[in-house]
């Protein structure tokens, strides 16, 4: 079966027109190699080293150089790529392998790259605290190069002068507390628009039995917020009377989420660069199409704004885009080129949309199935905020149970299986294992958050666990890396403060403003996870009934 799958895939690719002779030769060599290895995979393989079931992984005692972390024996040249291709999606294969081996650190070799996966908080802290400086770089991949405009932004660029420059810009000008406060009113406007939009959806039919697509609502709230902060606009196209997205806004979010799903997606040519251009799995084509879709919308706004500032037509700053364009160097010249502005605008957009929307969708799904948890959250909102005004960002410090629900969603249902990879700048040792220079270290979001040696009943949605040891103010960040909400360290998340505000306001407004219930005929919300990612397998659709006085649902401001 494995051989037939490889040969069928090869036949599909060979049907593509206009391949050069050298490309065909490379492809044939690759297919022959895979066919041979696929047959060889039928033979039993020797088991790999297992670690203790009660502690984080540690290597066997001995002398000499430390071993690599446990993992499958790699093949020459291609490493473990054949196993990866036959066990898609790759992240589920890696996690299953680690469970079977009983290890919290593992190594698979993809092409010539050692990929080290970690599911233990102690080892994760060793990477991002003790050795943060050595793991400060990023991999060079087709998707990251494309989405960063040739590594011109901060999040995706490898360690070097360009990353240092763009990171300074973000730290001093974009994610600083003063800038967060400066754009407070825009975030509030979008929270108000969210409230009215859901109200319109919930009341548009006389029967009142209207299903609300929570994923649609949550993602477009996040899209609205980032467009307002970045471009000072909710819409790229015509405003919608009900406050919802139009066709261009739907296209924008679809392209952004497609792009995020393609970043560091275990593409074969990222590990065998000589295959780049053949696009064996279609990855490169989809990356290009998604990037064009995002850039077509962003560039129209950025080009016009650049012209306005250069001509003197624009004089006052209103958003992040104005900040980036008007930055000056020591000589009074523009600090950023227009290409850097475009790359960083996309960077900021990618950083802020997926985590809040995913966490809120999962949390609401879990809570509809667990009325006691829902009741606790509603009681806190009624006690802290009441029903005579809408929840505001100033209420966030007091909404500890609401934040505990979001923390639990981050823990149990992370937005991605792994964090963005960290690349080792030099040979090092982690947890007693050898990690060679150039290795890609990935912290498993699902492995950390669901580690049974760290969490009691790890698969249970139980927000109270975050109140037992927390201080008076529950934070969405997790400093001990028992799970990952927003990444930390020198390559930490650029949108942690913004992401916290967006998550709590999105969740708070949905909970305070509406009573949520399962649609008629549905006994329980299906909490199945998608096979290809960590989102819900099916978008969450619920019945929403307004629970506040009608005058509190603000009118649409477009």
From Swiss-Prot:
Q: What reaction gets catalysed by this protein?
A: L-tyrosine + 2 reduced [NADPH--hemoprotein reductase] + 2 O2 = (E)-4-hydroxyphenylacetaldehyde oxime + 2 oxidized [NADPH--hemoprotein reductase] + CO2 + 3 H2O + 2 H(+); L-tyrosine + reduced [NADPH--hemoprotein reductase] + O2 = N-hydroxy-L-tyrosine + oxidized [NADPH--hemoprotein reductase] + H2O + 2 H(+); N-hydroxy-L-tyrosine + reduced [NADPH--hemoprotein reductase] + O2 = N,N-dihydroxy-L-tyrosine + oxidized [NADPH--hemoprotein reductase] + H2O + H(+); N,N-dihydroxy-L-tyrosine + H(+) = (E)-4-hydroxyphenylacetaldehyde oxime + CO2 + H2O
Name the residues that span the membrane: 13-33
Name of the protein in question? Tyrosine N-monooxygenase
EC numbers = 1.14.14.36
Give the gene symbol: CYP79A1
Q: Which family does it belong to?
A: Belongs to the cytochrome P450 family.
Q: Which InterPro entries match?
A: Cyt_P450, Cyt_P450_CS, Cyt_P450_E_grp-I, Cyt_P450_sf
Cofactor names from the entry are: heme b
**What segments bear the compositional bias annotation Low complexity?**
49-65
Query: What is one process in the GO biological process aspect for this record?
Result: dhurrin biosynthetic process
Q: From which source organism is this entry? A: Sorghum bicolor
């Amino acid at each position: 079966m494995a051989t037939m799958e490889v040969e069928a895939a090869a036949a599909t690719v060979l049907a593509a027109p206009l391949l050069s002779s050298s490309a065909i030769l490379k492809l044939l060599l690759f297919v022959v190699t895979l066919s041979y290895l696929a047959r060889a995979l039928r033979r039993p393989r020797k088991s790999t080293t297992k670690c203790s079931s009660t502690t984080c992984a540690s290597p066997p005692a001995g002398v000499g150089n430390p071993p690599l972390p446990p993992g499958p024996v790699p093949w020459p040249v291609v490493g473990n790529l054949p196993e990866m291709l036959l066990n898609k999606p790759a992240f589920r294969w890696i996690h299953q392998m680690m469970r079977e081996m009983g290890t919290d650190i593992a190594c698979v070799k993809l092409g010539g790259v050692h990929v080290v996966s970690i599911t233990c908080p102690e080892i994760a802290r060793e990477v991002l605290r003790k050795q943060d400086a050595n793991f400060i770089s990023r991999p060079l991949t087709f998707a990251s190069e494309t989405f960063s405009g040739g590594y011109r932004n901060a999040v995706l660029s490898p360690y070097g002068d360009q990353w240092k420059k763009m990171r300074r810009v973000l730290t001093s000008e974009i994610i600083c507390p003063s800038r967060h406060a400066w754009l407070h009113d825009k975030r509030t406007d979008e929270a108000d628009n969210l409230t009215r939009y859901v109200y319109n959806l919930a009341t548009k039919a006389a029967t009142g039995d209207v299903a609300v697509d929570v994923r649609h609502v949550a993602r477009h709230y996040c899209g609205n917020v980032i467009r307002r902060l970045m471009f000072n606009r909710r819409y790229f196209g015509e405003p919608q009377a009900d406050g919802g997205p139009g066709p261009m806004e739907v296209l924008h979010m679809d392209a952004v989420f497609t792009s995020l799903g393609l970043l560091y997606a275990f593409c074969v040519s990222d590990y065998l660069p000589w295959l780049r251009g053949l696009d064996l799995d279609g990855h490169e084509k989809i990356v290009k199409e998604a990037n064009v879709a995002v850039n077509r919308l962003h560039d129209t706004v950025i080009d016009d704004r650049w012209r306005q500032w250069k001509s003197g037509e624009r004089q006052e700053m209103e958003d992040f885009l104005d900040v980036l364009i008007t930055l000056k160097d020591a000589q009074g010249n523009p600090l950023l080129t227009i290409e850097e502005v475009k790359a960083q605008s996309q960077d900021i957009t990618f950083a802020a949309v997926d985590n809040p929307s995913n966490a809120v969708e999962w949390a609401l799904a879990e809570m509809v199935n667990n009325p006691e948890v829902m009741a606790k959250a509603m009681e806190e909102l009624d006690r802290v905020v009441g029903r005579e005004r809408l929840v505001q960002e100033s209420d966030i410090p007091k909404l500890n149970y609401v934040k505990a629900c979001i923390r639990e969603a981050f823990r149990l249902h992370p937005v991605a299986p792994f964090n963005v990879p960290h690349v080792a700048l030099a040979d090092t040792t982690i947890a007693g294992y050898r990690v060679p220079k150039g290795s890609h270290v990935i912290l498993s979001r699902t492995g950390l958050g669901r580690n049974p040696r760290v969490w009691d009943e790890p698969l249970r949605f139980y927000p109270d666990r975050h109140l037992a040891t927390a201080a008076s103010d529950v934070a969405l960040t997790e400093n001990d890396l028992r799970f990952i909400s927003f990444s930390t360290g020198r390559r930490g998340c650029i949108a942690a403060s913004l992401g916290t505000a967006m998550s709590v306001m999105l969740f708070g407004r949905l909970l305070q403003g509406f009573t949520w219930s399962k649609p008629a005929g549905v006994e329980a919300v299906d909490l199945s996870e998608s096979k290809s990612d960590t989102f819900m397998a099916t978008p969450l659709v619920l019945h929403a009934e307004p629970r506040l006085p009608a005058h509190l649902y603000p009118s649409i401001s477009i």
